[in-house]
Structures are given as C-alpha cells and as structure tokens.
Amino acid sequence: MSSLLLTTLDTGNTAWMIMATILVLLMSIPGIALFYGGLVRQKNILSILMQTVFIVAVVSLIWVAFGYSWAFSTEYADSGNPLACVIGGFDKCFLHGIGLDAIMPTGIPELTFAMFQCMFALITPALILGAFAERVKFSGYVLFTILWVIIAYLPMAHWVWGGGFLQEMGAIDFAGGTVVHINAGVAALVIALWEV
C-alpha cells in the first residue's frame, strides 16, 4: 500500500479516466437501454429499460460491497491463500482504504480506477440482456444477473485483470475482449439456445 501513496497524481490521466468512466456509463444508460428497447415489441420496451436501470443499481451495489475487492484485491495473493488464483480477497470490501489519496502507479486515484472498472461490471450483464429480451420474467432476470456477476464476471475480472492466474500466464486483455465480450457472449449464446 505504501508504494501506492508514493506515486504523484497525474491530472491528465485522472481527467481522461473520469471522462472514459462517464462514456462507458452512457453506453449502458441510455445506449444499451435504448438499443435493446428499439429491438423489442412495443409492449416490452418499458421492461427492457427497467432491466437496464436495475443492472446499474444492483451491480453498482455488488461492486462497492465486495466486487472490487474480489476482482482487484491482492490480499489472498499476499498471504499465500490458494484462493488467490480465483478471487482477490476481502480487504477492500465497501471500498475500504480506497480514496482519492491512494494513487495507483498510473497516476490516477484508486477510487477513479474502481469506478472505471465498475462501469465494465455494469455493461457486461447489460450486453446479455439482448438474449433475454421478451423471454424471461423480471424476477428471473434479477436472480440471473446477481448470480452471474458473482459467479462469472468477478472471478474472470480477477483472473485476467486483477493478478489472477491468466494474468500471471501472460494473458493481455486491453479492451475487455475476454472479461467483457467473451464472458457476455458465451452467456448470451447459452441463454439464446436455452428453451424456456
């Protein structure tokens, strides 16, 4: 943690990360909400919009409560815990110890990084929504989203971006090809092929 505090704030990087965070949020609401809303029958538009807003609310809560910690904490790796290859740990739950004064090696506050990564956690299940359109009740979608984020997204984010085993093997995922697109694509394919 002390190495994080020795880095100086890069205002240019920080400003760009804040702008990128806002742009990714706009891809979810209104972007995906309106896109999928335009693809369904008129009677289901409100349902799609509501499901997208639900994703933003619930996944944000999961991310703050324990998602960021599971994906990007190094607690388990530092202690030699065998779970380190799957999840990061619990030391950053509820963003404990993360503030504007904790500067990452890239020169941005860790809180800015956490919010940027939260936007990817939001948009990934929103991409899957298209496979569910007009096929599932809201309660079923709620259950799926919560479980999928916990079981599929958070471990994958740790494996590839948070120091997990894929990152240690040399996997590089610059634009979310693995964590976001493959992860959401496989889930959407399974749902699309699933007979209700």
Where are the predicted features?
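Hydrophobic alpha-helical transmembrane bundles of multi-pass membrane proteins
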Residues: 1-196
